[in-house]
Amino acid sequence: MSKVKKKSTSTGTIALNKRAKYDYFVDQKFEAGLVLSGWEVKSLREGKAQLVDAFVIIHQNEAWLVGARITPLLSASTHVVCEPMRQRKLLLNRKELERIIQVTEQKGKTCAAMALYWKGNKIKCEVALVTGKKEHDKRDTERDRDWSRDKERLMKHNA
């Protein structure tokens, strides 16, 4: 008899960093694994994560996710210290890591966390090489978004 595989109840996106799309121009994206502890995985299954000010730093040729908040569950173990804002190691291959190091050394460039999501039974983090937007760039983006919204409304109303 064959065993029936139990499907995971957690699927898709865990957390998005919408603020990063507003504040930065996205140049290139990478998919990275995360080194997590047990309580963090349980919290992520419940969707208790925030990436609002999350970014990537390079320390001793290793990538670290800084500023990501994973809130512990109320039922978390009492003998394990749960630190919601700790730095988490990112798992990238050598070429991706060298590319991130090379680009982030340039002025105005940084690496930001864009999303946390499930891929199979693994948790992945989408990191992107980004360039900061100026204030007028943000206004242009908002103006374009408003115009496309109005355009859709007009097309829907006329049809």
Curated annotation (Swiss-Prot):
CDD domains on file: SmpB
Keyword annotations for this protein, in alphabetical order, are: Cytoplasm, RNA-binding
Q: Name one GO cellular component term.
A: cytosol
Q: Name one GO biological process term.
A: trans-translation
The protein's job, in short, is:
Required for rescue of stalled ribosomes mediated by trans-translation. Binds to transfer-messenger RNA (tmRNA), required for stable association of tmRNA with ribosomes. tmRNA and SmpB together mimic tRNA shape, replacing the anticodon stem-loop with SmpB. tmRNA is encoded by the ssrA gene; the 2 termini fold to resemble tRNA(Ala) and it encodes a 'tag peptide', a short internal open reading frame. During trans-translation Ala-aminoacylated tmRNA acts like a tRNA, entering the A-site of stalled ribosomes, displacing the stalled mRNA.
Which family does the UniProt entry place this protein in? Answer: Belongs to the SmpB family.
Output this protein's name: SsrA-binding protein
Origin species, per record, is Marinomonas sp. (strain MWYL1)
